[in-house]
Amino acid sequence: MRTVSGKVAASTDPDRPPALGPAGAPVLVIVLSDFQCPVCRRAADATRQIPEEFPGDVRVEFWQHPLAMHPNARGAARAAIAAQRQGRFWDYHDELFRDQSALDPAGLASTAARLGLDVARFDRDRAAPELDARIDRESALAETLGARGTPAFLVNGALAVGWGSWSGFRGAVERELIEARKLIETGVPRDAVAARRAEAAIKDPGSWSLYRSLVVDAPQPPAAPPAGKKDPKKSKHSR
């Protein structure tokens, strides 16, 4: 299950979790993942594919959740964010999961070079102290909502930990989309549906408060147009 190039737009904000699919989609899937986790590797293709199944209706965000039991996971998370700063997160994501034996510092740099990244910039970026704060923030959401293992998924706030099958994952997203469409039919604005559903799914007030601050109230710039399509609102000099 590989994504179809250009069918789903990728986000461009280097300071937010990388995403596939439009901001304001009625279903938001947050993937809480660890690059050294073997089960996360099995789920990685599904992460890429699910927005392709429901284009325009589903947004996937990749949140870092490196587990302490995996010694190379945090370094890989930092490296992936450094690749994101050069607009290559998803390519780098694919390479890290393709070969989990190359997650040591030298292997991470070698992967960056193979993808054509500016390695000097990559090394500076992955050493930036603010990356740890971001990773800790993303992991805090996982821990607070009960995702102590990986992979974990928040489908409009509803938590599922572990990986069963592609059909099970797709079915869960499809069922949530049905519920989201019911809200839209009642007049709830399309871009408010994911938050409304998450608030209903997250019962603990403290957990909802953290989710709201990190996810709902965080700036959500629109995704870039799919490959081959130009955004008429932006000039060629826009970011």
Q: Where are the regions that the model predicts?
A:
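Typically the conserved alpha-helix immediately C-terminal to a functionally engaged Cys/Sec
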Residues: 33, 39-54
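Extracytoplasmic
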Residues: 24-26, 55-57, 63, 148-150
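C-terminal cap of thioredoxin/glutaredoxin-like
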Residues: 49, 110-239
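Structural microenvironment flanking redox-active thiols in thiol-disulfide oxidoreductases
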Residues: 51-112
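Short active-site neighborhood of thiol/selenol oxidoreductases, capturing the structured segment around
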Residues: 23-37, 60
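A short beta-strand-turn-helix
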Residues: 10-27, 52
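Short coil-to-helix leader/linker segments, especially the first N-terminal amphipathic alpha-helix
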Residues: 1-13
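Solvent-exposed loop/turn segments at secondary-structure junctions
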Residues: 35-38, 66-70, 98-102, 128-131, ...
